[in-house]
């Protein structure tokens, strides 16, 4: 099974679009899109990881 990841190197960003591209985080929370997810990853100091693309 290949590990999936998201490149969050350009984050955090002050504002995210309302684009709907759900990402499920390791905290079992569904983030609306990559921007929302990556901002949360930065806030978590890297402890939050990607579980899967799509809703949890």
Swiss-Prot record:
GO terms for cellular component: extracellular region. Glycans are attached at residue 45. GO terms for molecular function: serine-type endopeptidase inhibitor activity. Disulfide bonds join 8-38, 16-35, 24-56. Signal peptide: none annotated. It is found in: Secreted. Residues 6-56 form the Kazal-like domain. Keywords: Disulfide bond, Glycoprotein, Protease inhibitor, Repeat, Secreted, Serine protease inhibitor. The record marks 18-19 as: Reactive bond 3. It comes from the Eukaryota. SUPFAM superfamilies: Kazal-type serine protease inhibitors. PROSITE patterns: KAZAL_1 (PS00282), KAZAL_2 (PS51465). Pfam families: Kazal_1 (PF00050). CDD domains: KAZAL_FS. Avian ovomucoid consists of three homologous, tandem Kazal family inhibitory domains. This is Ovomucoid. It comes from Bambusicola thoracicus.
